């Protein structure tokens, strides 16, 4: 039958997006999916959950695992975070290592490469934020240093901000897909429920409001979601739970300013 033929031709891959905090992993995931699923903020450690994004086109399905940003393991907590990323990598078919243009390769980058090198999985290297690149020699140094550590399938300079290079990156990822049935239906974007996605977006906005505050004490609870009758609008009521009173003041001030 036609369904059987389609199944026989299907290809898929589970891909872990890994890298240090704030190199743009969530932004790249959102660009690859064509929608906003992962929380994007300029604060370290803002990807709270292991949000999985699913991209399906024709016979190919790519399943992305957006791991928490890698912290250089200066202490036991940092070491735990590195191990958390490594455990995610162990479950995937390929890795996408994201580094930032204009910055030198750190020990944390090297450590991560060594950890998934032992697993023997194919890996791509994406150098993000090339729109901010001022010195091409820094880019060439990054490529040379990381390529000496690992035989990447491809090195792709990209800008998640303006989309430059993202089509080329997607094509390289598609090339990593192996024959095998799809794990998710065609219209699936994430394994996270709708309320979790909405809560993450609200939390992102709250983090942007707290420019000088540490973001670890904020949680968002969705109290109510209801489609507005006859309109393509969703009414949402949410509670933002703050660990510190100073957070409340910042958020209320920002809300009042937005209303004006």
Residue ranges: model-predicted function:
Residues 165-227, 237:
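C-terminal end of P-loop GTPase domains and the immediately downstream helical coupling element
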Residues 254-260:
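Conserved small/polar residues in nucleotide/adenosyl-binding loops
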